[in-house]
C-alpha cells in the first residue's frame, strides 16, 4: 500500500500545479486564466473518456506496468512543460496527463488497493490511500514551494525560472521513483495473471449494461460529482489571492500548501468513518455543511 501511495502521490502535484502556482503559470507560459481553464477542461474530458476503460485495462495488465507507465509518462510531460512551449503544445501535454493519470493509473490504483484490503477493512484501506496520497502531495508541494522561494528570492531567477525549477523537481521525482515501484511490486500478489476463464468482449458489454442500470452507482456518481465541484472551487484560490488580494506568489503558495496538509487527516477520518458509521447520513451532513450559504447562515445566526 505504501508503494501505491507514493507512486500515485508523485503524479498529481504537477498535474494540479495550478492550485499553488496559478499566477506564476499564467506569467511563465504567457497564457490567460481562460486558457488555463481550457487546459483543465481538456484534462477533465480525457478523464471522462478514460476512467471506464482504465478499469478494463487494469484487468489485462499488471499494476506495476500501468503505474510505472503513468509515473514516467507524467514526469517526461512535465519536463516538456518546463520548456514553456506554445499554448497548442501545452494542451497536448494536458491530454497526455489525462491519459497517464486517468487511463493507466486510476483503475490500477483502485484495483491494487482493493486486493490488498481485507473485505471488512475496505473503507479503512481506501482512507489510508487517500490520506497517504494527500501526505505525499502536501510534502512534495511544500518542497516545491521551498524550491520556488529559493530560486525567486535567493538566486533571483524570476518567476519563470523559479517555476521551471519546481516543474523539474516534480518531473524528476516521478521519473526517479518509477524503477523503485516497478521492481518492488514484482513479487506482489497484485501481479497475479489474468483469469483465463474471464469473459470476452460480449461479457464486457453485459457487465457494462448491468453497471449502467444499477441505481446505486448513479447515486454514488452524483455524490462524487457534487464533492468534486466543491473540490474544484479550491483550485482557484491561488489565483484569487494573488490577483484580488495582491499577495505574493510565495505567500499564496504557503496558504494553499497549508490547505493540502489538512487532507491526510481528512482521509484517515473518512476511512474509519466508512467502516464504523452509517456512510450515507454522514455524507449528507458533510455536503450540507460544505455549502457556503449554510456556513454564512450559521455564522449570521451565531452572531445574533
Residue map of PLM features:
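C-terminal ends and interior cores of transmembrane alpha-helices
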Residues: 72-86, 288-303
Amino acid at each position: 500500500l505504501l508503494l501505491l501511495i507514493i507512486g500515485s502521490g508523485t503524479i498529481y502535484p504537477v498535474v494540479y500545479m495550478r492550485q499553488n502556482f496559478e499566477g506564476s503559470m499564467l506569467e511563465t507560459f504567457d497564457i490567460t486564466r481562460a486558457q488555463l481553464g481550457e487546459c483543465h477542461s481538456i484534462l477533465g474530458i480525457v478523464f471522462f473518456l478514460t476512467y471506464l476503460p482504465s478499469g478494463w485495462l487494469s484487468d489485462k495488465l499488471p499494476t506495476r506496468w500501468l503505474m510505472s507507465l503513468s509515473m514516467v509518462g507524467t514526469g517526461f510531460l512535465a519536463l516538456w512543460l518546463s520548456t514553456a512551449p506554445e499554448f497548442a503544445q501545452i494542451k497536448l501535454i494536458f491530454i497526455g496527463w489525462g491519459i497517464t493519470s486517468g487511463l493507466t493509473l486510476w483503475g490500477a490504483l483502485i484495483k491494487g488497493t482493493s486486493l490488498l484490503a481485507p473485505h471488512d477493512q475496505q473503507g479503512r484501506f481506501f482512507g489510508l490511500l487517500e490520506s497517504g496520497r494527500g501526505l505525499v502531495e502536501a510534502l512534495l508541494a511544500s518542497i516545491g514551494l521551498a524550491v520556488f522561494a529559493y530560486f525567486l528570492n535567493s538566486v533571483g531567477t524570476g518567476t519563470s525560472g523559479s517555476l521551471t525549477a519546481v516543474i523539474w523537481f516534480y518531473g524528476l521525482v516521478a521519473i526517479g521513483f518509477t524503477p523503485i515501484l516497478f521492481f518492488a511490486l514484482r513479487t506482489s500478489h497484485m501481479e497475479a495473471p489474468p483469469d483465463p476463464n474471464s469473459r470476452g468482449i460480449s461479457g464486457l458489454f453485459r457487465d457494462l449494461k448491468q453497471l449502467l442500470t444499477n441505481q446505486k452507482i448513479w447515486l454514488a456518481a452524483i455524490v462524487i460529482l457534487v464533492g468534486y465541484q466543491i473540490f474544484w472551487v479550491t483550485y482557484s484560490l491561488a489565483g484569487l489571492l494573488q490577483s484580488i488580494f495582491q499577495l505574493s506568489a510565495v505567500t499564496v503558495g504557503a496558504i494553499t500548501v497549508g490547505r493540502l496538509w489538512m487532507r491526510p487527516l481528512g482521509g484517515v477520518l473518512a476511512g474509519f468513518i466508512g467502516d464504523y458509521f452509517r456512510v450515507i447520513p454522514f455524507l449528507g451532513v458533510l455536503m450540507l455543511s460544505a455549502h457556503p450559504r449554510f456556513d454564512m447562515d450559521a455564522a449570521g445566526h451565531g452572531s445574533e
